[in-house]
From Swiss-Prot:
Protein name as catalogued: Tyrosine recombinase XerC
Organism domain of life: Bacteria
Gene: xerC
Alphabetical keyword list: Cell cycle, Cell division, Chromosome partition, Cytoplasm, DNA integration, DNA recombination, DNA-binding
A GO CC term attached to the entry: Holliday junction resolvase complex
GO molecular function: DNA binding; tyrosine-based site-specific recombinase activity
Organism: Shewanella oneidensis (strain ATCC 700550 / JCM 31522 / CIP 106686 / LMG 19005 / NCIMB 14063 / MR-1)
Keyword Cytoplasm: yes
UniProt family annotation: Belongs to the 'phage' integrase family. XerC subfamily.
The Tyr recombinase domain, residue ranges: 115-294
Length: 306
């Protein structure tokens, strides 16, 4: 639906109709997307200064509109949609020869804040890892979860492990990470014990290859199967949040930082290319420190009434 034309110059209205047709036919955008673009153009037009319309708008005008929308409380996602609409409008007018420069080119919305990953607290993780049973699947799943939490591996890294990947005497695991970069990661005693218990069962399974973690039929365990089994155990152990591999990786990183505060060491353990990727966990760690401060510092909270 086009913006109302009662107070819009006929030339501008004509270009809007052409823009709508161009989006639908040449760009082959969905009707929903086209409607959104037209709505966003109308939203921006209503905030333009008097005497400025969609054909003579300048970069400074769009900057002012962007600031107004931001002050109105629009989310970064909504601002990005608005910017996409006005940029497409400018590109269309350029192609049509109506303007010489796209006034929206180069404008950017505030970055969307990345949600902090949620970790599982130590007590809940301990409860999760206390699964009981001596059947092969339980022993295998326990070894998988112990290793995830012990070493902070990615799902793909753990699924790709072979029998030769774990060095039991040194308590280390050789991991092939992103970009085929190899790293050596320590493995805790509980994880080593759990893997050893699983291997006693694995030896009884005819296997197609040297995969460390296999199905009952001897095939390498898939990513999806690992995720499903972990989700199952989270439900059976009555955890308050859904359990998945990346959550154990987050928990590993957070708990390591809570204990050591050695950001670069955690970066190496996680296999992060850049330190900035690891720094997100400092936000989580600060949340923990803030709670400790509030509970422990004598002047962090009001004293009880005497």
């Amino acid at each position: 639906m086009n913006p109302p034309a009662d107070d819009m110059p006929a030339r501008c209205h004509s270009y809007l109709q052409q823009f709508e047709a161009y989006m639908q036919s040449e760009r082959q955008l969905s009707a929903h997307t086209v409607r959104n673009y037209l709505y966003e153009l109308q939203r921006g037009r209503e905030l333009l200064p008097e005497g400025i319309d969609l054909l003579n708008v300048g970069r400074e005008h769009w900057q002012q509109v962007l600031a107004k929308l931001h002050r109105k409380g629009l989310s970064p996602r909504s601002l990005s949609l608005w910017l996409s609409a006005v940029k497409q409008w400018g590109e269309f007018l350029l192609r049509a020869g109506a303007i010489e420069l796209n006034p929206a080119k180069g404008l950017s919305a505030p970055k969307q804040a990345k949600p902090l990953p949620k970790n599982i607290d130590v007590d809940s993780l301990t409860h999760l890892l206390e699964i009981d049973g001596n059947d092969p699947l339980t022993l295998r799943d326990k070894a998988i979860m112990e290793l995830f939490y012990s070493s902070g591996l990615r799902l793909a890294e753990l699924a790709a492990l072979d029998l030769s990947s774990v060095q039991y005497d040194q308590r280390e695991v050789r991991v092939l990470g992103k970009g085929n970069k190899e790293r050596i990661v320590p493995v805790g005693r509980y994880a080593i014990d759990a893997i050893s218990a699983w291997l006693e069962c694995r030896r009884q399974i005819p296997c197609e290859d040297n995969a460390l973690f296999v199905t009952e039929k001897g095939k390498r365990l898939s990513h999806r199967s690992i995720q499903a089994r972990m989700s199952k155990w989270g439900q059976e152990q009555a955890l308050s949040m859904r359990v998945h591999p990346h959550k154990l990786r987050h928990s590993f990183a957070t708990h390591m930082l809570e204990s050591s505060a050695d950001l670069r060491a955690v970066q190496e353990l996680l296999g992060h290319e850049n330190l900035s990727t690891t720094q997100i966990y400092t936000s989580l760690d600060f949340q923990h420190l803030a709670k400790v401060y509030d509970n422990a510092h004598p002047r962090a909270k009001k004293q009880q009434d005497k």
